[in-house]
Amino acid sequence: MKLCKGAILALAVSYGLTYCHTTKSKLTLEQKSDSLTVIHITNPTNYILLPIEEEAAESQVLLDTGEAADTDMDIRLAQTQVDYFVPFALPAGAKAATVRVRNKSKDALCWKEIKLSDTFDTANTEKFRPVYHHTPLYGWMNDANGLVYKDGEYHLYFQYNPYGSKWGNMHWTFCQ
């Protein structure tokens, strides 16, 4: 009986290791033309971290889910240097994800620097970033709209570009 339990345990561990190995995230680039690259991701992490160059021309980045609501985001992907990274959320629990990037050349630095991650460090390490006044964890904000008191809490609403430090990709969000 001990032999059977040992064999079953060995099989279970072997299966577990195989399962962990086969669910590893993988990113592959398919450069369809000089201005269109498709990023295929198997077993996506929470984010794809996009390398940003402040002075680069904007590229159009689209998480392609096949839904009518899919929208291009204008993002300054790194051409020759990486100034910082921004997280681009991937679908939770999906087996695969597709990201289409238009208007970024095949030789751009971003293709070597792009990475997958389940986390994004938002520690305040910037010398001039305020501690007392509200700022988003990353990105650009504008048009703070006063405090709104609702359900016993104050909310501050503002416009937000999560993909860079310049105007664009307007999202509305709030903090409590």
Label each residue range with its predicted role.
Residues 1-26:
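Bacterial Sec-dependent N-terminal signal peptides
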Residues 21-176:
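Beta-rich carbohydrate-recognition and catalytic domains
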